[in-house]
């Protein structure tokens, strides 16, 4: 079956997480992604957080499925020739270097356009133009500078970062959408363009409900936040609100049966207005249906702590799955707190390809996330990540059309091997 991005060729200069997230998604949709790596070492994540000595780490394998790997010394004159040929033969160049690195390699935007006017150059940076544009950014820095950390945590505690990689992986997903959009526009214009996604911008985009709340503060307190019911004044910035729902419907994480020994024996419970009477029936507080302190959403706002304390008395008598079954039967919105172990073992996620088992020649079988986006006419087959330089000769021959003699010359030039160290005189 034809894949959605069949015929699109990506020159992948990305490393670590943000860029590889982007290019892996494009590869899952069928693009031919050629990952260019430093001879001898490759992507730094091959050796980071290794659980098995001398094999590619899960950090690398889970971000580089469905790609081809070539090694290339871009400082070598022959290596520059190969890179020029690749730029001429590809549709998109993706990079997440530090500011100015691509220019210092001799491949400015103008130079790339001269080589291939249809080339799309896609970049992930830490910040957009401004006072911080030259700063180095990693996941947690992005969360802190994009508004996520200041609004995550409890009101009386420090800012917290989330376990979800919204800075790295989130920005990679944003960039992938930008690339596909640029490819579509190129069909009409015939021209390439630059696509940039800044990590600060990506985090702020995912934190947009907090920017919403920042503006609401000018008109009064945020009544769905716990501190309103506790009578605590609001300041001039959106506060941290613990596990309060961000969607305007009061919600909290509540203990379930077994919480004393199971750190994930919890459920998220939302007191949605249309099912309030059903909630009252479930927890045995039928009198709350008509009580003036509880009967209407505005009246309940000042009593949320008491309401959730009573609901928690009920949830603590049930496992999180028992509670979920009961609540779902009444359309009461809730969700169990699922551990990574539970997710890895969930047969429904295996069946949909959301969690996949991949076989690797040196590390054996391992689990990975699959494509979270399902296309009916372009199903994803997750293939293992490449070994370092595994496809170098294949790409030189099939993509660039070099013959055996030319490939041998490139090898002899040292363009595909680690730079030789000069012996001390």
UniProtKB/Swiss-Prot annotation:
Residues annotated for CoA binding in this entry: 17-18, 38, 72-75, 96-98, 104, 136-139
Enzyme class at the top of the EC tree: transferase
Pathway per the UniProt entry: Metabolic intermediate degradation; oxalate degradation; CO(2) and formate from oxalate: step 1/2
Active site: 168
Keyword flag Transferase: yes
Biological process, per Gene Ontology: oxalate catabolic process
Top-rank taxon: Bacteria
Classification via Pfam families: CoA_transf_3
Segments passing through the bilayer: none
UniProt keyword Transferase, yes or no: yes
Residues involved in substrate binding: 247-249
Catalytic reactions on record: formyl-CoA + oxalate = oxalyl-CoA + formate
GO molecular-function terms, A-Z: formyl-CoA transferase activity
EC number(s) reported in the record: 2.8.3.16
Protein keywords: Transferase
Quaternary state and interactors: Homodimer.
Summary of the function given for this chain in its UniProt record: Involved in the catabolism of oxalate and in the adapatation to low pH via the induction of the oxalate-dependent acid tolerance response (ATR). Catalyzes the transfer of the CoA moiety from formyl-CoA to oxalate.
Similarity section: Belongs to the CoA-transferase III family. Frc subfamily.
HAMAP family: Formyl_CoA_transfer
Protein name as catalogued: Formyl-CoA:oxalate CoA-transferase
Gene: frc
């Amino acid at each position: 079956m034809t894949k959605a991005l069949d015929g699109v060729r990506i020159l992948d200069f990305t490393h670590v997480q943000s860029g590889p997230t982007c290019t892996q998604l494009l590869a899952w949709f069928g693009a031919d992604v050629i990952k260019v790596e430093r001879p001898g070492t490759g992507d730094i994540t091959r050796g980071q957080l290794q659980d098995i000595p001398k094999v590619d780490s899960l950090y690398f394998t889970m971000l580089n499925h469905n790609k081809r790997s070539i090694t290339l010394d871009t400082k070598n004159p022959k290596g520059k020739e190969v890179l020029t040929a690749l730029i001429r033969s590809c549709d998109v160049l993706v990079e997440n270097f530090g500011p100015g690195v691509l220019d210092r390699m001799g491949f400015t935007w103008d130079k790339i356009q001269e080589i291939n006017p249809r080339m799309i150059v896609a970049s992930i940076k830490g910040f957009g133009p401004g006072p911080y544009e030259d700063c180095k950014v990693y996941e947690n820095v992005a969360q802190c500078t994009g508004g996520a950390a200041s609004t995550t945590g409890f009101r009386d505690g420090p800012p917290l970062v989330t376990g979800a990689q919204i800075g790295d992986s989130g920005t990679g997903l944003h960039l992938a959408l930008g690339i596909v959009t640029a490819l579509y526009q190129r069909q009409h214009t015939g021209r390439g363009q630059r696509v940039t996604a800044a990590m600060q911008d990506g985090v702020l985009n995912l934190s947009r409900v907090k920017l919403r709340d920042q503006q609401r503060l000018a008109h009064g307190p945020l009544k769905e936040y716990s501190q309103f019911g506790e009578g605590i004044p609001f300041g001039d910035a959106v506060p941290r609100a613990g596990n309060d729902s961000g969607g305007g419907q009061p919600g909290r994480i509540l203990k379930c049966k077994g919480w004393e020994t199971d750190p994930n024996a919890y459920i998220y419970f939302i007191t949605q207005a249309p099912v309030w009477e059903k909630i009252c029936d479930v927890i045995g507080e039928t009198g709350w249906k008509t009580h003036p302190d509880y009967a209407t959403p505005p009246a309940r706002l000042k009593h949320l702590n008491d309401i959730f304390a009573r609901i928690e008395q009920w949830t603590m008598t049930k496992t999180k799955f028992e509670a979920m079954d009961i609540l779902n039967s009444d359309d009461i919105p809730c969700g169990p707190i699922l551990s990574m172990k539970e997710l890895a073992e969930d047969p429904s996620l295996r069946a949909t390809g959301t969690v996949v088992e991949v076989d690797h020649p040196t590390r054996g079988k391992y689990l990975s996330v699959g494509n979270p986006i399902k296309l009916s006419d372009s199903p994803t087959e997750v293939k293992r990540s490449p070994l370092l330089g595994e496809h170098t000769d294949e790409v030189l021959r099939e993509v660039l059309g070099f013959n055996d003699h030319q490939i041998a010359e490139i090898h002899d030039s040292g363009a595909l091997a680690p730079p030789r160290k000069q012996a001390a005189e």
